[in-house]
Amino acid sequence: MDIRNLKYVKQFISHNLINFKKKTYKNSNKILVEVYDYKPSTIPISYLSNILAQKYQANIVGYYSNFPSMKKKFKTLLEIFNPYDIKKIYKSFGVEKFIIPKKSKHTAVEVLFTKIFKKINTKEDVLDIKFDGIVFGDLIYDEFLRSSNRMTINITSKQFQYFLKDAISLYLFWKNIFKLENFKSVIISHHVYFMGFVSRIAIFKNIPVYSIGITNIQYLTKLNQSKHCAFKSYSEVFKKFDISLQKKLLIDAEKKLTNRFSGEKDIKLLMDRHTDRDFYNKNISTKKILSKNRFKVLISAHQFSDAVHVYGYKFLFDDFYEWIDFLGKCIEKTDYDWYIKFHPSEHEKNYKHINYFSKKYPKFKILPND
């Protein structure tokens, strides 16, 4: 934590201790709240968890979504000496205990692994993985890419097989926890990666799930398990507004889009992760990049390992690697100029992937990061 922010954390803890009077309910009801170490998000989390605790007369329990790594264990050890660590923040608004995942019994994991793995013949089969009728394949796929910084999955690799066993072990842990505990509601930070395991199980059991961020809250259901599900109903909701409000909103939207494309800083850009680039300077480059007199195709590539299936998993391609690889093959059938602009987020992390495609398809013209 930046030492300059310590005073704000101290103020927040004091605020919580004053406004959220600790109350212990003598029943089994619990509100399960993800421990998410992004300080701005703890503000709405603190309020929502207490509202739900009051509604259900329930105690608040914090949880970590994944097995602790050695790095995480070491960090937890150091937090003992930090008066303002994330656990102390959660305790300040009423969290009584914390659930930390532990590896499940080896035999149970091996039995389920054998059953699941024999059905995996393609990467698409990974996306279709289900445990007890609940789809977890997309979460497993994305967590593997993210944790190993890979573009795609090699289903025959030992690394993936070991990883799949860990995923099974994590599922069995949470399956058992949900059997033992009486959770009345669940609060999560994200519905992707291994963080999504808890919400998938809770939704399957008809337990109310809320995905919360610094600017919004989504109620997740069996039909809408994504925090982005609200986008689907935007047009229908918009039609319910009176004409004068619709006009005002359209003008405001046009202004925001204009500002975005002109490089102005807005709330979305300020919240996004650091890109190692300054998009807001006024320097005009005279460097010639595009060739003349030929039809041009621009590919705006994604970040290869960043929640590939965040919007779902039934698409034309299993991942972003398959998409770019397909386009690379298309190059051979055209006389166009093909330019590819890689995602600026975590550009250095993505660099080995950029090199891979530039060597495999030399006709790809890689645009500079700036």
Task: Describe each region flagged by the PLM.
Residues M1-K30, I51, K55-I168, I214-R277:
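Conserved N-terminal ligand/cofactor-binding loop architecture of enzyme catalytic domains
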Residues E34-Y38, Y63-F67, I188-V192, A301-Q303, ...:
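Structural motif
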Residues V35-I45, D306-G312:
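A short, glycine/small-residue-rich beta-strand->loop->alpha-helix junction that serves as a flexible
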Residues K39-G62, F317-I331:
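Histidine-anchored nucleotide/phosphate-binding helix
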Residues N59-I60, I207-Y210, N216, W338, ...:
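Hydrophobic beta-strand scaffold residues
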Residues L170-N224:
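Conserved nucleotide-sugar donor-interacting segment of glycosyltransferase catalytic cores
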Residues S262-K360, I366:
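Conserved catalytic-core segment of nucleotide-activated headgroup transferases in glycan assembly
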Residues N369-D370:
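Conserved active-site histidine-acidic residue motif and adjacent donor-binding/catalytic loop
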